[in-house]
Amino acid sequence: MINKKKLVTSLVTSSLLATFTLGSFADAHTYIINNEDINKNAQESSIGTLKQNNFKQSTIDSMKPRNLQSFQEDKVFKAPKEKTPITERARKSENALSNSKLNDVRSFTTVNMRTNENERTAAKLKYNGKNTNVWVADNYITDKQAKNIGEEFDNKIDPLVKEKFGEPSDVDHDGKVNILVYDIKDDFETTGSYTGGYFHPRDLYDVPHSNKAEVFYMDTYPSMGTDKNNLNEKKVYSTLAHEYQHMVNANQKLLKEQKEDGMDVWLDEAFAMASEHMYLQKPLDHRIEYYNNSTSIANGHSLIKWNHRGDVLSNYALSYLFSQYLSAQSDNGDKIFKEILQDPANTSEALENAIHKHVDPKMSLGEFMTNFRVALEKKEATGLHGFNGAPGLNSISPKPVRELPQTLAPQGSVMFETTSPIKVPKDKDEKVNYVKVK
């Protein structure tokens, strides 16, 4: 006999009444509902009532003071509407980054994440390497640390990302990328979340506020630690791999393919975190931890709507796990990332093309994403409902929803438990799929 409190919830215009618990229990019947719509701009599909709240902050508050990295964000910037190429005159300017030598000072346009305003940040060139320049605008970073960052990029990160994703652009014709190391102004002190780094596509064009070169921006505090007198530059190496993927992605989509916008953000971020995973050669535990604790994910957070409900950290967690599921299911492993990136089709079509080639020629993208949601719960060693035994992913632990919503956003999903089997309602929306997992 079950003694726990029960919740009776109406599903889809009273076509189904089921008894749900407020927590897990023995001999439960477990179901996953997924909205298989792959159009991120589509209307939500009907299934029940959701009282929305500040899921992101409630999740952060419940996790403090755990792994700080769980709250790291990567600011996403859209490509500029005007895409004026950088001119030879701009490249030859005495203030161009490409015309710099060691210990030169240049002024960069940076973004204040608190206000979203542009600012000027003066930085000194502290490493002039084969493939990268490291600029420092933080008195707590030593010359040795700047050199360590540059050498790690030149020797490990650069060849890895080029092999797995492709080549960066070279808009200033110097064959290098620039890494600006400074304390990004973010909301860490007030919310606990912070910006670990960013890449801005405007830098690839001759437009207002552009730095007219390949630049990505790396945070010192708190990304390298919360003791400013003892910062650890190694903590941002994986973020370097993350941001570099964004730069390579932008080169492919914006410059080579001449697209108005780049790859859909959710998949671009998935690839960036896959880049981190490959560099570290281990799972991103902080993303798994956030997934396991996320109130918004339990309540139907969308995989493909970026910053859904204002909880971008849940999107990072879902995108990361999707990248690992995709490579686990593909018959060519992580080579599938580069293949998708270099497919000129739109994001959904490129993904489905790769799934047809490397997973199942008859499976739709929506069906693949439903299998992904099931895999998060079942984690089977082989087959569609797991990660093929990939180490470290068995710690994934989705939470059952406490109250079923009436609607799910495109690629939103919930898991729920009942005391007895249910019948799938006949009047559910067409793209809503129910799967019994236990």
From Swiss-Prot:
Pfam families noted in UniProt: Peptidase_M30
InterPro entries: Peptidase_M30_hyicolysin
MF terms (GO), sorted A to Z: metalloendopeptidase activity; zinc ion binding
Regulation: Inhibited by metal- and zinc-specific inhibitors, such as EDTA and 1,10-phenanthroline in vitro. Is resistant to all inhibitors of serine, cysteine and aspartic proteases.
Cellular component terms per the entry's GO annotation: extracellular region
Cofactor(s), by name: Zn(2+)
Gene Ontology BP terms: proteolysis
Post-translational modification as stated in the protein's UniProt record: Several different N-terminal ends may be produced, the favored N-terminus is position 102.
pH dependence: Optimum pH is 7.4-8.5.
This protein's UniProt keywords: Hydrolase, Metal-binding, Metalloprotease, Protease, Secreted, Signal, Zinc, Zymogen
Protein name, as recorded: Neutral metalloprotease ShpI
